[in-house]
From Swiss-Prot:
Biochemical pathway: Glycolipid biosynthesis; lipid IV(A) biosynthesis; lipid IV(A) from (3R)-3-hydroxytetradecanoyl-[acyl-carrier-protein] and UDP-N-acetyl-alpha-D-glucosamine: step 5/6
Function summary: Condensation of UDP-2,3-diacylglucosamine and 2,3-diacylglucosamine-1-phosphate to form lipid A disaccharide, a precursor of lipid A, a phosphorylated glycolipid that anchors the lipopolysaccharide to the outer membrane of the cell.
Catalytic activity entry: 2-N,3-O-bis[(3R)-3-hydroxytetradecanoyl]-alpha-D-glucosaminyl 1-phosphate + UDP-2-N,3-O-bis[(3R)-3-hydroxytetradecanoyl]-alpha-D-glucosamine = lipid A disaccharide (E. coli) + UDP + H(+); a lipid X + a UDP-2-N,3-O-bis[(3R)-3-hydroxyacyl]-alpha-D-glucosamine = a lipid A disaccharide + UDP + H(+)
Source organism (scientific name): Enterobacter sp. (strain 638)
Highest rank taxon of the organism: Bacteria
GO terms (BP aspect): lipid A biosynthetic process
CC annotations in GO: membrane
The entry's keywords: Glycosyltransferase, Lipid A biosynthesis, Lipid biosynthesis, Lipid metabolism, Transferase
Stated name of the protein: Lipid-A-disaccharide synthase
Family: Belongs to the LpxB family.
EC number(s) per entry: 2.4.1.182
Gene Ontology MF annotations: lipid-A-disaccharide synthase activity; phospholipid binding
Amino acid sequence: MVDNRPLTIALVAGETSGDILGAGLIRALKAREPNARFVGVAGPLMQAEGCEAWYEMEELAVMGIVEVLGRLRRLLHIRADLTGRFTDLKPDVFVGIDAPDFNITLEGNLKKQGIKTIHYVSPSVWAWRQKRVFKIGRSTDMVLAFLPFEKAFYDRFNVPCRFIGHTMADAMPLDPDKNAARDSLGIPHDAHCLALLPGSRGAEVEMLSADFLRTAQILRQTYPDLEVVVPLVNAKRREQFERIKAAVAPDLHIHLLDGKGREAMVASDAALLASGTAALECMLAKCPMVVGYRMKPFTFWLAKRLVKTDYVSLPNLLAGRELVKELLQDECQPQALADALLPLLADGKTRHQMHDTFRELHQQIRCNADEQAADAVMELAQ
């Protein structure tokens, strides 16, 4: 730290998830250094914790190639301006929170100026575009990783990495209250319950909803009392799902939910979901699951060649085996999905073993991530 100056931390967050992480980190650092100064690109939560925003986070929150190209000049201007201002400020540590396409280059620029840099949240370099690890190694003094297999990957390339656990694992209880979740959703305690989560993106909902609904129809033949809950992320996805349901399964009774994905998982005996963060959340909710995923044929062909992992879902990557059934592309058919879900809806050995393994994995990644991240920042700042 610079003599006679309070701890000064520069941060850049590019989206809502990064704002949540940044706010938790700032809170943990303020508990140790009450006079610390925080500056950079911040969302409302980070600003509420006292971070001085040189730019609003929304400036960086662009998705899709067309949108990025339309904003490229502005994004490059912001990065160049931040490089200059942070170089003049000489913060004790710079923390780039996610947003790797923006932050890793910025981290490299600052590291060349002698500023300590941290990249918080590993990009999926272990899964695809693995050569990015070399740029990350040149650009950062430390990567903070949510998952243990991410640290193992960086260790192979001698890139400093600290496994800090996952903030979602900290936020969710080890033993969720299933009956309370059912009460809040109006689901009888003694009914069988299935959650359908066909994804958050329009393309996913379009590709998966029909087969997910047909799967529920098949399962209801075995379990006539089956309650089906379908949480959707926003009004647009709900409207899209309702249109597909009207064409495919107009008579299937379901509970459509606005948001409430976590409650639906906790309340359910089993879930059928697209992969992604939802699979991790479902594991932490202790809800046995099957992953079903389909994409356009060329995209799948390309993904098979680019992706370097044996599994697509985080529970399987954490377990190092096929704990959760993954039915991808041509295998993602209603009968196959139903066959995989049947033993999970039955109150038997398969379901209980999966539940117990989920609990063990939860404990592995429940490490108080905010405090661990603050430890890493303080160690670099010395």
